[in-house]
Every structure is written in C-alpha cells, then in structure tokens.
Amino acid sequence: MKATRALVLFLLTVLLCPALASAGTLGPALNYEELLDMVRRAKDGDILLVSGEMTATEEAISSPALLQISGDSRAVLHRLHISDSSVVLSDVELRDSLTISGISNVELRAVRVEGAPGQSGLSLVGGGTLLIDGDCEITGGEGATGVSVSQRGGDLYVSVEGSIRGGEGGGSGMEVSPLSEYGTMMLAGTIRGGNDAMMGGTGLNLFGLSGNAFITVAGSIRGGRGAAGGAGMQVVSIGDTVSIGVNGEIRGGSGDEYGGNALIVMDAAGAAAVNLSGMLIGGDASAQTGEPGQSLLVIGDSVAHTRVANCLLQDGENTFAYNKAVTPLPEITSSVNAVEPLTTPSPTATSTP
C-alpha cells in the first residue's frame, strides 16, 4: 500500500506534465504582483513567464491549477513561498530560501536555491511530492540546512537527483523529521554538510521516523570539514516498520583533530530496519594525534535493527605527514672561469747571523 500510494503521487505529477505542451503562456511578469495576478488567472498547464529580479510578499503562490513558472537567464525570485499548489519551477534562481507548505506537488528543473542567513535553502512542511532534478543546486544559508523536510498532514514522496549542500558554518546537508505513514524518499543525488572551523555539518540527518516510512539512499553523502569532521549520515529514533536502505556512498567529513563517522545508528525500535549494501568510509584526521572516523557506529540495541550485506566498511586514516626539512646546498652564482685564482707568495730569504 505504501509503495502504491507513493507511485500514484509520482505518476500524478508526471502524467499531468503533457498538458504543459499545449498550455497557454502568460507574461512575462516583471514583479511579484504581476506574477500573483497571472497565478489567479491561470488554468491547468499554463506557463507563467518571469523576468528580472523580484521579491515575494507575504502572499504565497497558491492555485488549484497545475502551473509552470519559467524564467529567463535573468530571473531571480526572493523569499518565494508555495502553498497547496502543483507547480513546476524551471530556469529560475531562488534566493533567501524557498518555502513549500500544505499539500503541494513541486518539481524543480534547472533551479538554483540559496537560503537566507540562518535559514534552510528549501523548507518543506506538509505532504504531496517534491522532485529535485539532477540539474538543480540547493545551498543552505549560513549555519543552516540545505533541505529540511517535515511530513505533516498527508502522504509524501520526495526524489532528489540534484546537489544539496549545508550552509557554511556547519549546516547539515539535508534533515528529515518527522516522516511517518506513507512517507517515501529516493535520495540519489549529492548531499554535503557545510564546512566549519570547529565542526563540519552532517550530510544527512534522519530523525523521528515512524509508521511504514521508506527511504532509499542511493547517492553520495558526505559530512562537512572542520576541526572535527561531520558525520556522513545519522539515523536517530526510528520505529514501527520503518525501512531505510543504503546502497550509495556515505563518507564522514575530514577533520584536523577528528574525522567524522560515516554512519551513526541509534534509538531504533519495533520492526524498523536499516539495510546496508553500499560503501561506508570514515573521515580522515590530519593532526599528528588526530582520530579518524569510523565507518559504522551502532549504539545500544540498534545493533539488532542494522543489517550489513555486501557493504564496504572502511575506517578513516590519519594522514599526518612529518615535514622533513632539507637544507639546500648553496647556489653557485658565478662561472668557474670568473673566479680569480689565489696567488701563493714566494718564500722570503732570511740571513743567518
């Protein structure tokens, strides 16, 4: 039932997309008020063109119609909020975060998202579908998460094929909490924690999963760099019949004093399972007394819920190297022929008394 519902949500978005081919075109909108006016007038499949730079007001994009908002090479939208809508966003740059709420179906194509300072690049609170295509880049604001997902009030399907990164200052790459009944995710892109002088951000955080939530991690996940490297992936507090499958590459972040652990699993209960068949590689440490990260750290009774099959486990390494200074020979600055020979004086005769 879980897989069927997720498939229906996915196909709903995909099957409606052909309507875009015969859609009407509105715009271009040069400011947010013009964009809102087009949204109110739009019908299923309409393409809304935007151009230039605009800042959203407190009024969210909300429409019962399936829409495509498409930009030109100069289109920049600030503080965009989409609520209870089905929207395809393409060829636009989104600054100061993208917020999605309610039951929404959103697809990002060739979209670059940058979070405001201290805020996630993309924040989803609700249900529906979120598709992040492979040509998308999402970065969290300073110290903040790249993508934050909280399932509230409906089925949820999330597919990630693009690049996600936590903000500088140790932001996590992606956080999911909570995820419950009929929550399904396919994470096949690249997810990185942000770097920091002290502690790198975690690549992927999965917290508070319940019901029959299902997540497949098939991409490349890595913790951020710092004095202590961030963990590649953390799974904390999962229960019921939650299933997490890892067949991608998970790496702890490199650090000066401590390398990050590749995968940490703790507080697993019920019939929840974490199935590992990919690559888990701990982060390296570069200081002389640095401690590399572990490939897999399972805490307490979570051992009974973690299954390893055909999985490469490799702890990090201490990469400290002594600097063997070599004193160079003096440089010859002139030709041998230019050196004047030393004259040996002749002996002087002395008289004998």
Where are these regions (language model features)?
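N-terminal extracellular ligand-recognition/capping segment immediately after the signal peptide
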Residues: 30-36, 45-67, 72-79, 92-94
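Ser/Thr-rich, Proline-interspersed low-complexity disordered segments
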Residues: 21-23, 342-352
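Surface-exposed loop/turn motifs in large extracellular/passenger domains
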Residues: 44, 63-68, 82-91, 99-110, ...
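Bacterial N-terminal signal peptides that target proteins for export
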Residues: 1-10
